[in-house]
């Protein structure tokens, strides 16, 4: 993939990630002045995950590092705009949730219950379930670590 096509793919990915970030921010009753920042943070998070995956990271580690980035930026923006960090961060990580692998795991479970046990369906179910669980865990841990680092009251030593 050439550099120009990669930049266009990255811009498309970031633009398409900003749309659900704004949509979920509206569902969560985020103030109107913060909607553009939710969109920007969702685009930054999804774009950074795409860059890391293109560099060879697997999706779980790329998601974890992108969630760390989103959490850190969200805390900084919350100080600038005098708002809670969750206003920016929760809606921004929604585009990184593992919809396809969770859906594939659920379809595999339904097929196993309908057609009976088969080894390939069970492997598909377990691999997609573990992948989706790992991504959700990476998102939750990645969002919580910056708050633990930056809001620490006691000295680190």
From Swiss-Prot:
The gene is yjjB. It is found in: Cell inner membrane. GO terms for cellular component: plasma membrane. It comes from Klebsiella pneumoniae (strain 342). Keywords: Cell inner membrane, Cell membrane, Membrane, Transmembrane, Transmembrane helix, Transport. This is Probable succinate transporter subunit YjjB. It comes from the Bacteria. Belongs to the ThrE exporter (TC 2.A.79) family. The chain crosses the membrane at residues 2-22, 55-75, 87-107, 129-149. Pfam families: ThrE_2. The transporter is composed of YjjB and YjjP. HAMAP family: YjjB (MF_01191). One of its GO terms (biological process) is succinate transport. Involved in succinate export with YjjP. Both proteins are required for export. It is a multi-pass membrane protein.
């Amino acid at each position: 993939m050439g550099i120009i096509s990669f930049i266009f793919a990255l811009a498309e990915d970031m633009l398409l990630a900003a749309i659900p970030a704004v949509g979920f921010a509206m569902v969560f009753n985020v103030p109107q002045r913060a909607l553009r920042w939710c969109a920007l943070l969702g685009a930054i998070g999804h774009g950074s995950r795409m860059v890391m995956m293109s560099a060879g990271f697997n999706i779980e580690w790329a998601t974890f590092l992108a969630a760390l980035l989103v959490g850190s930026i969200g805390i900084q923006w919350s100080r600038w705009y005098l708002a809670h960090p969750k206003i920016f961060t929760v809606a921004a990580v929604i585009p990184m949730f593992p919809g396809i692998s969770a859906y594939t795991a659920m379809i595999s479970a339904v097929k196993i219950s309908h057609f009976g046990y088969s080894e390939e369906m069970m492997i598909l179910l377990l691999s997609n379930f573990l992948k989706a669980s790992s991504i959700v865990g990476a998102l939750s841990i990645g969002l919580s670590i910056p708050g633990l680092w930056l809001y620490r009251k006691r000295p680190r030593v």
